[in-house]
Amino acid sequence: MSTPRSDPAPVPPREPTRTSRGGVLPTLDDPVVAGASELVGGPAGRRLLVESRWWTPLRVCLLFAALTTLVFGFGAKEHCRSSGWVPNNMYFHACYSDVPPLYSGRGLNQGLFPYVHSDAVLAAHGVYSQVEYPVLTGMLMWVEAKLVPGDSKDPFTTYFDINLLFATAFLLGMVALTALTARRRPWDAALVALAPAVGLAMTINWDMLAVVLLAGAMYAWARDRPALTGVLLGLGTAAKLYPALMLLPLLLLGWRTRRLGPVGAVAGWGALTWFNCNIAFVLVNFEGWKEFYSLSQSRPAGFSSIWYVLQINGHGFTPLNTWASGLTVVLFLAIAVLALKAPRRPRLASLTFLVVAAFLLTNKVYSPQYLLWLVPLAALARPRWRDFWIWQAGELVHFFGIWLYLGQYADPKRGLGDTGYTWTVLAHVAGTLWLAGIIVRDILRPECDPVRADGLDDDPAGGVFDGAPDAGPAAVAEDRPAVPVAG
């Protein structure tokens, strides 16, 4: 049996872009940041000594995140906060949020505990739907509702503000975890902190909980803690199903490096954690617990999915579940082939981004807050401002487009029609495909990968895969015995 060889070094390595402490300086690493730095005196010198004990990269990124929340998370929603959560306000001022309507729509304002009541009990309280999210999200909704003072003059806005505080805490955690996961590249977390689409989308729903849990799982894996990774993935999956998708990249890289033991530990701890989060609700009221899963199975093509756009343009697909699931599986298989056949072992963040992006592009619905799922993964997978902002631009076009499209039902004269809306969805799809395509290019040509290009890093978020021997195509080719040539 041949012995696996280490990953080939990228060629040619460029001059390291580091400070005295080993951190990458963005003005020496990213062309966009270098160009922008000319406004304040140009890029940092090669001998710059960064010794500030207070304004560390992490603290600066956290300040950026706080400003993003203030301007976009709070400021952009101020019209709805002051004028009411009604369709004309929410759609035409782009301040829509699910949070205030569901406060009463799911009985949270009456103190009803999610999932445990029968439909008859809910109906007696004027509530006609179970909470349609996984249990950890439902628990967050309930906790936030319990924090609303009983004498609040505007409990709906108070509930929104409480959710904003939770979302802000999750954003700060997401930024910190991204910076720590990136190791020598803490400034990459500024991509997360300064993304306007994050500020705009963070209060639409409760997705930030799952996003920060997946960011925590990435950090735990980077620190070689598979049990903690599994627990955080289990919690994330109990809040939103998508964090479980990280298991596919882990499995592929575990197979390629022959290090499947830690991957099995992640899967085991994740399954146990998810089970413990759910079992009580299953036993108390199975019908209430399964609402999320039943809705996911039965729902038709939802707003902003490729299936909805095809449908409104006269190209419906039936049965939709088969088409959507089939296309998802095809893309996952393509990613698996890429992971196993690439000339050098791909990085974990790169594969995780591709898997989540594939799921989002083929899913039956694409809500505007789903962009949050990709943001920390994008910062780790492709830490380049140009590509990140091309993707963000597409998401911003879609963000405003979906509200104008929904606004036509409140005021047809001001709303956006099918054609205009189709173009905004295509902007989101094109932006996501652009970033995914660049990441695929980096996998096929590792010398183009910003993280690996200076020859100092392999896979900072890779945990046991970082610097591991590679049993991929390059190693196989080197181990193959030479074919004798007849003389």
Residues covered by each model-derived region:
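Multi-pass membrane glycosyltransferase architecture that uses lipid-linked
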Residues: S2-W289, S325-G487
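Periplasmic/ER-lumenal interhelical loops and adjacent helix-loop junctions
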Residues: A280-G326, L333-A336
